[in-house]
Amino acid sequence: TIKKGEIIKFGHNLKNEKNCINLTKPLPSKNKFSKYFSIDDGKYSFRTIKFTKKILIGKSISSFTMKPKKGLNIPHSIYDNNEQKKTYLNYIKYFDKLKINAIGLSFVQNHELILFLKKKYPKLILVSKIENIKGLKNCENICKYSDVIMIDRGDLSAEIGDEYLYNAIIKISDNAKKFGKPLIMATENLETLSKNINPTKNDIISLGFSSQVNSDIIMLSEETAISKK
């Protein structure tokens, strides 16, 4: 459990010491210093104390229980293209043995990564997740060269700010439609079903909005993975 006001250090390959959380991947190569960052799709926030290429230190805004395999969101971060290429090549080599025909690409920032992977694996279906500021800026070309587009509303809102989420979704969906690419809407579509038997009115309205912006697929995750009902 992380307590309100507790100072936590995040980093890749850190030593096992108190108040340290090891990340599975390195921190972003470039970043615009942000006063706050968050985890778990923006649910829990930290005030930034120190941010370098190797460590991120923050003060927790609230008390909460830290669960494994939750994402870290640092607004306005830019990820290294070469590191992304290496990461996905390693994943695809492993998946290729399992005869998997599609792969989701997180934090796609431009179409270069897509063309690079398509050249090496032309038959592989690439699902590009547009979920940060650079990906949103280049979403037209990302939509043009991808096979499928996914909007991760949780990561996207945590990266660009809640106030920009609505217009960002419209922009991405318009470009997906422009190039005739299937659109997946993900994150918190029926989140209350992780605790309740029936969806709320907000859930229903959210699904209606996803339909209006031409979503072809509604993706459920926590709603079905951790339901207590």
Model-derived segments and spans:
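Non-catalytic helical/linker scaffolds that mediate oligomerization, partner binding
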Residues: T1-K229
